[in-house]
């Protein structure tokens, strides 16, 4: 069983660094394509300020020169979902579960264990980077599929842009999750609710050592409970009353 989570734009490098591991050939090809951009080209590529583009340029060049600092990916990424994941003070069983079941889908690194070393970078599948004449999605599709082809159960906490990197055969095995708030009988869904809830849900999976869809349905976390009336066999809906 694998649980898939996306990367995040926000990063925290105020952490102890860890040893890097060599980039896979597929990752090196992506890095080589990114490294062709100047700082000013990155400004329009990323749609960011000149200052932010200069910072990203330095990050890319440090990776290229193999001088970049690396951190455990789960702790490096620091978006809203990540800040709601239990990342410290894990029991031995929780640490084992995290290492064996939780994987991050990255447009630079591929599908990797959540605590893999990563360097600060910015890249996602909505970005129009050409890699050896291919889109990022087509560049990664075979590698992404290979990472999951033996899995019977795949929990996806990904957004659709990441899910569509996988083939239909792999996507057919994915169990997806929606998190909603019930405000006086009105069901609301928005990105802030979803991101926080995804982090809290992953924490509940880790703490309860969940291995099956049935076990996931029984979870009660951060005020969210499973709603069978709103769910499908492979699309689980959790609702919080506010």
Swiss-Prot record:
It comes from the Bacteria. One of its GO terms (biological process) is response to hydroperoxide. Belongs to the UPF0246 family. NCBIfam families: PRK02101.1-4. It comes from Streptococcus pneumoniae serotype 2 (strain D39 / NCTC 7466). One of its GO terms (cellular component) is cytosol. Disulfide bonds: none annotated. Pfam families: H2O2_YaaD. This is UPF0246 protein SPD_1378.
């Amino acid at each position: 069983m694998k649980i898939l989570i996306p990367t995040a734009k926000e990063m925290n490098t105020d952490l102890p660094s860890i040893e890097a591991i060599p980039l896979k050939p597929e990752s090196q090809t992506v890095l080589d394509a990114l490294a062709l951009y100047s700082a000013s080209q990155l400004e329009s590529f990323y749609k960011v300020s000149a200052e932010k583009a200069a910072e990203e340029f330095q990050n890319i060049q440090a990776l290229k020169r193999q001088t970049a600092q690396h951190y455990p990916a789960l702790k490096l990424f620091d978006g809203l979902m990540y800040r709601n994941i239990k990342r410290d003070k894990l029991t031995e069983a929780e640490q084992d579960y995290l290492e064996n079941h939780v994987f991050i889908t990255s447009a630079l690194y591929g599908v990797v264990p959540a605590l893999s070393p990563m360097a600060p970078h910015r890249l996602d599948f909505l970005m129009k980077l050409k890699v050896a004449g291919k889109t990022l999605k087509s560049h990664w599709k075979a590698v992404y599929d290979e990472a999951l082809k033996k899995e019977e159960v795949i929990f996806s906490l990904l957004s659709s842009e990441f899910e569509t990197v996988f083939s239909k055969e792999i996507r057919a095995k994915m169990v997806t999750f929606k998190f909603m708030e019930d405000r006086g009988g009105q069901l609301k869904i928005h990105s802030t609710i979803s991101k926080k809830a995804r982090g809290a849900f992953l924490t509940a999976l880790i703490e309860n050592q969940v291995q099956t869809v049935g076990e996931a349905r029984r979870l009660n976390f951060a005020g969210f409970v499973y709603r069978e009336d709103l769910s499908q066999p492979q699309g689980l809906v959790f609702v919080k009353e506010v």
